[in-house]
């Protein structure tokens, strides 16, 4: 039994060294067709780093031949599967430039766009890649209106837009939290403008209204009437846009408080 255990352990440790040894032999080989065949085998086995190294070594050998397109195609996917999305993005783009009439062009164009999505950062970080992702995915939709990937592309755009919306909301909420009420109100209204179909539209409008109310309350006495009137205007817009909103009664309270304040100031 002990002998069997020792043998198994030795075998487990020996396999990686054997694989490394075989890969080393492939790298040293002078036979380009053999190297390409082995690169394809590594690719099929999911050993993308090994496949990639071989593919890139073979670029000058097969460039201009009928084997170059598939080599380039698989090399781009190696970067993607290794999660090196920036490099994959560049290689998929390069493929489209080198093989504009390829039967794979639609697929590769989608993968190029998908790489932008894969580089999107979390909501609390910079959203430059999110904006880029929306742009390139929309371009894909425009250029391939009949693609089976259209639904998936639209879903990615929706996710990206939701992330941008969440980022803007955080900024507005932060302004509100630190007492910068006018800036908060402007940001909440910007959310309505940027995302008119948002399910949270009435919440943004209510927060804008409340922000303007707090801004008016903290304003110089000489400017309060004008700023309470802004709250009333915001309420009228709220009631017109969202007559069935569950937040309507709360918005009405701030409207009535503002009207009361205006009357008090005018009567002094």
Question: Where in the sequence are the language-model features?
Answer:
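Acidic, polar-rich low-complexity tracts and alpha-helical solenoid repeat scaffolds
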Residues: 3-4, 16-268
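Bacterial N-terminal signal peptides
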Residues: 8-16
């Amino acid at each position: 039994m002990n002998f069997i255990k020792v043998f198994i352990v030795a075998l487990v440790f020996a396999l990686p060294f054997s694989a490394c040894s075989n890969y080393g032999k492939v790298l040293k080989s002078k036979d380009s067709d053999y190297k390409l065949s082995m690169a394809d085998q590594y690719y099929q086995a999911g050993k993308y780093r090994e496949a990639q190294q071989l593919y890139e070594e073979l670029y000058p050998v097969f460039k201009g031949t009928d084997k170059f397109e598939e080599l380039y195609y698989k090399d781009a996917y190696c970067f993607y599967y290794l999660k090196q999305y920036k490099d994959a993005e560049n290689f998929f783009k390069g493929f489209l430039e080198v093989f504009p009439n390829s039967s794979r062009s639609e697929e590769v164009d989608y993968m190029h766009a998908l790489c932008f999505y894969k580089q999107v950062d979390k909501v609390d970080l910079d959203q430059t890649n999110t904006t880029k992702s929306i742009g390139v995915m929309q371009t894909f939709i425009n250029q391939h209106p009949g693609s089976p990937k259209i639904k998936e592309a639209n879903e990615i755009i929706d996710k990206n837009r939701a992330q941008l919306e969440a980022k803007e909301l955080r900024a507005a909420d932060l302004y509100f939290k630190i007492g910068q009420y006018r800036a908060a109100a402007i940001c909440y209204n910007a959310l309505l403008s940027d995302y008119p179909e948002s399910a949270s539209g009435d919440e943004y409008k209510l927060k804008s209204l409340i922000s303007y109310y707090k801004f008016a309350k903290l304003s110089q006495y000489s400017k309060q009437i004008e700023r309470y009137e802004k709250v009333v205007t915001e309420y009228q817009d709220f009631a017109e846009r969202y007559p069935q909103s569950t937040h309507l009664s709360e918005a009405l309270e701030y409207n009535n408080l503002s009207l009361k304040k205006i009357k008090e100031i005018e009567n002094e």
